[in-house]
């Protein structure tokens, strides 16, 4: 996997509580939950969460995988499986004024490199913002 970073950026939102002095510096519960995607039919835990190609005329035997870091090795500590209630999360990095950034990674994976073919690769994944 050769992961590339992408970000989800929040703006114009208050991340710190504005209540009493005791909780003024507490960061609100803000996180991203991946809830769906065009995933391969999982036959093992290894390929759970892989995003399949939506193009019939595109690359074959190659998938996309979401992860929490830029490691070239994808494993249970960094792989994101959409809709998994125990999915790995990334921390919110606060911006100086009213906002924050979540940084994720996406890369190509293949369980059978000898069968992989080149071509366009398109897929999708859906996320939701949880803000308490």
UniProtKB/Swiss-Prot annotation:
It comes from Klebsiella pneumoniae. Transmembrane segments: none annotated. This is Protein MrkF. Appears to affect the stability of the intact fimbriae on the cell surface. Keywords: Fimbrium. InterPro entries: Adhesion_dom_fimbrial_sf, Adhesion_dom_sf. The lineage of its organism: Bacteria, Pseudomonadati, Pseudomonadota, Gammaproteobacteria, Enterobacterales. It is found in: Fimbrium. One of its GO terms (biological process) is cell adhesion.
């Amino acid at each position: 996997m050769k992961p590339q970073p992408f970000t989800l950026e929040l703006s114009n939102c208050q991340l710190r509580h504005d209540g009493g002095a005791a909780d003024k510096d507490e960061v609100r519960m803000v996180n991203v939950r991946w809830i769906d995607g065009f995933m391969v039919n999982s036959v093992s835990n290894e390929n759970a969460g892989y995003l399949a190609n939506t193009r019939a005329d595109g690359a074959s035997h190659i998938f996309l995988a979401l992860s929490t870091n830029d490691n070239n090795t994808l494993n249970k500590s960094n792989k994101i499986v959409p809709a998994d209630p125990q999915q790995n999360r990334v921390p919110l990095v606060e911006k100086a004024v009213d906002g924050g950034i979540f940084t994720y990674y996406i890369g190509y994976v293949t369980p059978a490199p000898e069968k992989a073919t080149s071509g366009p690769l398109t897929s999708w994944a859906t996320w939701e913002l949880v803000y308490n």
